[in-house]
Amino acid sequence: MPVFLSSRFLFFCIIVPLLISITLYQLDTFDPAHHPADSLISSTASIPPLINERFLTGAEFIGVGLLNSPEDIAYHEDSGFIYTGCVDGWVKRVKVAESVNDSLVEDLVNTGGRPLGIAFGIHGEVIVADAYKGLLNISGDGKKTELLTEEADGVRFKLPDAVTVADNGVLYFTDGSYKYNLHQFSFDILEGKPHGRLMSFDPTTKVTRVLLRDLYFANGVSLSPDQTHLVFCETPIRRCSKYYINGGRVELFIQGLPGYPDNIRYDGDGHYWIAMPSGVTTLWKLSMKYPFLRKITAMAAKYGYEPMFMENAGVLQVDLDGNPIAYYHDQALSHITTGVKIGNYLYCGSLWHSHILRLDLLKYPAQNKKL
């Protein structure tokens, strides 16, 4: 190749695109921050002694094609129904049978938004954290939907996420971000700044209180069995913490999770189950460590390209002190957002799948595995 051609090739095919990329990077206003140093600790810090790394081998699928992205799950013991919220706005309930083929899916009500967290009030009503509507109360077998709250301290919710209900009727819930909505949530993760809040709503006084602010994408929340504290998850920094209701003290519950926590559920038998939509991949690890990589990823997302980092999803079982007990996951699994133990089964919701997953914990137990 003549020298002048090779020089032109170098200039137009390498130097010009590089200069354009640098200019776009400098002009883009997205400004990611460094994550706290303790959020970058090894993911092996919370690996338990018992592991099932072939979740999909024994998984059964419930309501295939009828449950579009069932993000959270709540079990109503008296009726035997599982309640969930779907991406099309429907809150549905599922009567589960021994054979998944005999399971019955019913429509309850369409919120007109995106129902995420779901729980039951003390009078049997269905409480929903709707990403676009706020905190909802559904009663009368789906005939009545009431908006309970949509803002706190003058700041409107952008991403109501998870909810749990105390024995005295007080609702505790999270707002993942006051800056980004559900459609934009990846930008909140990539920005690396604490926009999340933990809140309470008292149905008697109608008062919404901010209990904690400046959380890193506040996600799942669960009440302790003695009702003294909450355990809540912060997704990007792979951490769960305790919030003591009397006094407001905060202390670490578990950190260095093997994945990015979403919902957390107490099983009534001394254990919490923490769902993780993705394990700690190399791309995730690098992006969390280096803000400039998150800025590049955010810029790409603005132009319609979002690299998929999600793999090796699963559910971690921990005891009341946050000690890891068992880990159920699969390299080929992604977007698992909740895990609820009902009897001998683990039921899992998802932001991606069109069904609920079920795993028989007796047939497919987690076993000792030397790492």
Curated annotation (Swiss-Prot):
Signal peptide positions (record): 1-21
Biological processes, Gene Ontology terms: response to ethylene; response to fungus; response to jasmonic acid; response to salicylic acid; response to virus; response to wounding
Gene Ontology cellular component terms for the protein in this record: endoplasmic reticulum; vacuole
Keyword Signal carried by entry: yes
InterPro entries: 6-blade_b-propeller_TolB-like (IPR011042), Strictosidine_synth_cons-reg (IPR018119)
Modified residues (Phosphotyrosine): Y303
Broad class of where this protein is predominantly found: other
Keywords: Glycoprotein, Phosphoprotein, Signal, Vacuole
PANTHER family per UniProt: ADIPOCYTE PLASMA MEMBRANE-ASSOCIATED PROTEIN HEMOMUCIN-RELATED, STRICTOSIDINE SYNTHASE-RELATED
Family, similarity comment: Belongs to the strictosidine synthase family.
Protein's name according to its UniProt entry: Protein STRICTOSIDINE SYNTHASE-LIKE 6
Organism for this UniProt entry: Arabidopsis thaliana (Mouse-ear cress)
Gene: SSL6
